[in-house]
Amino acid sequence: MLEILKAVILGIVEGITEFLPISSTGHLVLVDEFIKLNEPKKFIDMFNVVIQLGAIMAVVVLYFHKLNPWSPKKSRLERSQTWTLWKKVIIAVIPSVIIGLPLNDWMDAHLMNWLVVSIALIVYGVLFIVIENHNQNLRPRFDSLNTLPYKVAILIGCFQILSLIPGTSRSGATILGAILIGTSRYVAAEFSFFLAIPTMFGASLLKLYKFFAHGGTLAGNQGLILAVGVIVSFVVAYASIRFLLNYIKTKDFKAFGWYRIILGVIVIAYFALLAH
């Protein structure tokens, strides 16, 4: 029962942090110090990635009409715009496949530590504040996904590669990149959500494949633990996405920047104290 409760808490953390630009990894590094599943490391590593499937499904459910090119309620123009949106998303994910996929395991092996995570939290927190201050009196060049050029989509996809560095935040890197290029906050957030679908779905499937291909099995309650994490992640991510979309209608991302800086300092302070 305790392991199920831990899965609920980890699902909540994943659901809240996956689409807010605050780094799910940064939070899991801290949470892992206090709430660690009493399971083999191989299962825990797989669990931490695969619970993202719940967050992905939250995007699919929330945006099902917008993302469905076969909807009978859409006009021919709207169906064409939906197909074009998917083309932009697929093009944007290419840099992660070409560059990110080969580097992923190396990054996890060499950079997955509290110091890298905390530095990334702080650096990107500062960047959010600086860029928002710079853009506060500027009109966005792209205020609709329909007007977003393919070259801008692929540039945003290039920013996603930065999220290979633990603590960066996939949504943080893509939203920051999109705003820097000149999109509105709303377009930046939505495109980041859509870009997550192939990116995170692919990452989750790859992790599952590696888990089972290397002899992993779901023993005891592990299947239930994984299912609970995915379901909780879905419910919380759904609420988190709705919150963010409502928030950025009237506010900017500076609060998230300050939050990242504070969290980064807390991570450094906590592990520095542990070392002594």
From Swiss-Prot:
Domain of life according to the entry: Bacteria
Subcellular location: Cell membrane
Keywords, ordered alphabetically: Antibiotic resistance, Cell membrane, Cell shape, Cell wall biogenesis/degradation, Hydrolase, Membrane, Peptidoglycan synthesis, Transmembrane, Transmembrane helix
Any one GO biological process: peptidoglycan biosynthetic process
Keyword Flavoprotein part of the UniProt annotation: no
Enzyme type, top EC level: hydrolase
Keyword Transmembrane: yes
Pfam families: BacA
InterPro entries linked: UppP
UniProt main location, coarse: membrane
Catalytic activity: di-trans,octa-cis-undecaprenyl diphosphate + H2O = di-trans,octa-cis-undecaprenyl phosphate + phosphate + H(+)
Membrane topology: Multi-pass membrane protein
NCBIfam families listed in its UniProt record: PRK00281.1-2, PRK00281.1-4, PRK00281.1-5, undec_PP_bacA
Family: Belongs to the UppP family.
Additional detail: Bacitracin is thought to be involved in the inhibition of peptidoglycan synthesis by sequestering undecaprenyl diphosphate, thereby reducing the pool of lipid carrier available.
HAMAP family, per the entry: Undec_diphosphatase (MF_01006)
Name of the featured protein: Undecaprenyl-diphosphatase
